[in-house]
Amino acid sequence: MKKIKLMSLALVLIAGYGCKEVKKESQETVDEVEDAVEEIKEEVSAEIIKFSMEPKSDSNVKGDVTFNEENGEVKMTAMLSGLTPGEHAIHIHQNADCSAADGKSAGGHWNPTNEPHGKWLASEGYHKGDIGNFTADEEGNARVEFATDQWCLGCDDENKNIIGKAVIVHQGQDDFTSQPSGDAGARVSCTGIIE
């Protein structure tokens, strides 16, 4: 009888220990899954903002511009219509204010680092808003794509944060040399970059 009690006690202890190990392994698995889910959430949590471009300077230029921030990079995509066929400049300007009929309420090019105007990434210098030129097709339509790690959406770095600025499309092309703005002509479309 004593042997049976000892064997029963041993079985209970073995079963209890086994359950404890299973529970410990289960908790480790749960922790691993939760960590993986957190990593996926961080990767997926891209910030996307979209704005409509307003015609300026008696033009018919309109469209949408989208900013997508993901993995430390901001991608801008602009879909435009109503342009004259050919080359046009697109820049980020200082103020998210498109109230003036000529778009000049948006101020000059966004230039937080006080560099001379120039082509993007030029060794002689460039404004953080100097996106560059694009080509409108024969129907006056254009798609502009631009990506950089030198911008952010709402971060604390004023040398990178484009919130509170404006996107301006110009009548002509940027020559990348004329100071302070590239002699790109009238502002034909504008939108503020606001959250």
Predicted regions and their residues:
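Bacterial N-terminal signal peptides that target proteins for export
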Residues: 1-7
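N-terminal leader/targeting pre-sequences
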Residues: 5, 20-87, 94-195
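C-terminal motif of bacterial Sec signal peptides marking the signal peptidase cleavage site
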Residues: 15-18
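Sec-dependent N-terminal signal peptides
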Residues: 7-13
